[in-house]
Amino acid sequence: MAESKLVIGDRSFASRLIMGTGGATNLAVLEQALIASGTELTTVAIRRVDADGGTGLLDLLNRLGITPLPNTAGCRSAAEAVLTAQLAREALNTNWVKLEVIADERTLWPDAVELVRAAEQLVDDGFVVLPYTTDDPVLARRLEDTGCAAVMPLGSPIGTGLGIANPHNIEMIVAGARVPVVLDAGIGTASDAALAMELGCDAVLLASAVTRAADPPAMAAAMAAAVTAGYLARCAGRIPKRFWAQASSPAR
């Protein structure tokens, strides 16, 4: 069986499910969901931390033994993202960053030009960069070439719950990647998470699918099981697809 731990940079994680915190109704529900998910790495919007003092969320993650992964959510330019990452490094004492540079508020689609520019600057500044990108294999390769520790293509736009719109693109990114591939954004339900792993992704990052579910802790548990099931199925190897039926028992 393949390596069971997720390895990004110089760190390893037993869980292949990375959680986000956006959209949670309150910290009590978020805590239950995080515990149910089994996650060891959870994103934190540094702007949100600055706005509310951040003590409640950061204290919660610390108490649960979960590593915070600051992100640059809301940034619209490379300069803005780099500054936000540097502030996060000072505030949270980490050089890890989930890099987001968004083109507009309606689509929340990554701005490819600004994203690459920010990635280059942050890598040069010693950051471990995990960029949120489109499902374009060429852009994913470009980000990898800049020195990013992973690539994080979207399945579909953030918060839509549309699942994986272009499975073949994700497979192409996986096939060409020399770093971990994390499916990020668009997950709606457990089957989407399982499919991401079956397509070859090394991990899944999600937030809205859990925080906006009718029962967030139950959905978090479902997502954890789905990620594990998809990973195990990929490692086991699916049977080839056939045009015609084939009896499972030999004919006499």
UniProtKB/Swiss-Prot annotation:
One GO MF term: thiazole synthase activity
Binding site for 1-deoxy-D-xylulose 5-phosphate: G159, A185, G186, A207, S208
Intracellular or extracellular location(s): Cytoplasm
Gene Ontology BP term (one): thiamine diphosphate biosynthetic process
Residues forming the catalytic site: K98
Catalysed reactions, semicolon-separated: [ThiS sulfur-carrier protein]-C-terminal-Gly-aminoethanethioate + 2-iminoacetate + 1-deoxy-D-xylulose 5-phosphate = [ThiS sulfur-carrier protein]-C-terminal Gly-Gly + 2-[(2R,5Z)-2-carboxy-4-methylthiazol-5(2H)-ylidene]ethyl phosphate + 2 H2O + H(+)
rRNA-binding listed as a keyword: no
Broadest EC class assigned to this enzyme: transferase
Protein task: Catalyzes the rearrangement of 1-deoxy-D-xylulose 5-phosphate (DXP) to produce the thiazole phosphate moiety of thiamine. Sulfur is provided by the thiocarboxylate moiety of the carrier protein ThiS. In vitro, sulfur can be provided by H(2)S.
Name the record gives this protein: Thiazole synthase
